[in-house]
Amino acid sequence: MMSITEIVDQIQHLLPNGKFSQDKHLIITGGEPLLGWQRAYPALLREIYDREMNLTHLTFETNGTQQLDSKFKDVLNQYAENNGLEVTFSISAKLPASGEKWESAILPKIVSDYLEIHGHRSYFKFVVSTDLDVVDAHRAVAEYQSAGVGIPVYLMPVGGVNSVYELNERQVADYCRNNGFRFSPRIQVPLYKNEWAT
């Protein structure tokens, strides 16, 4: 396993001039990046800020099922308030088509906790391909909203390869237009054919 120093060395190597620029985001994805790693992120942020890498945007791609540790919340709020760090939770809650049980996947109390981070820019992203998926997305949004979670909602077409993606891209765009959702393309599919490291 890489050390925090080695991870930040690698991040710095990938950045122009070793710094975040032009609103570049540090996006932490997974698996589930909030599962078991919350204790490591304060050291990661400290190392990035100690190196003066100009980080202003941090995004966690999460399924919205992991409670934030209180110490980690405090650290995120400190960086948000003292350093202007914009924290985003891209919440891709799993709908029944993914095989997840509703009561395990749609957890408004946990997501509402994410929204306590100072100046957060969070949103939902539901991966859909059928009318039933859209019905489930509506149901999930209603459940979150009834718990006070009112954040933007994106729909993203299913498909890691062009042949599948092209089948439902237009359909999902139409769902968005007709239902007031935002459309999120899988830009890596048409551009890079979802090749490794894209």
Can you describe what each PLM-predicted range is?
Residues M1-I27:
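Conserved alpha-helical substructure of the radical SAM core
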Residues G30:
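Active-site acidic/histidine clusters and adjacent loop/turn architecture
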Residues L34-T198:
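Conserved AdoMet/S-adenosylmethionine-binding subsite of the radical SAM
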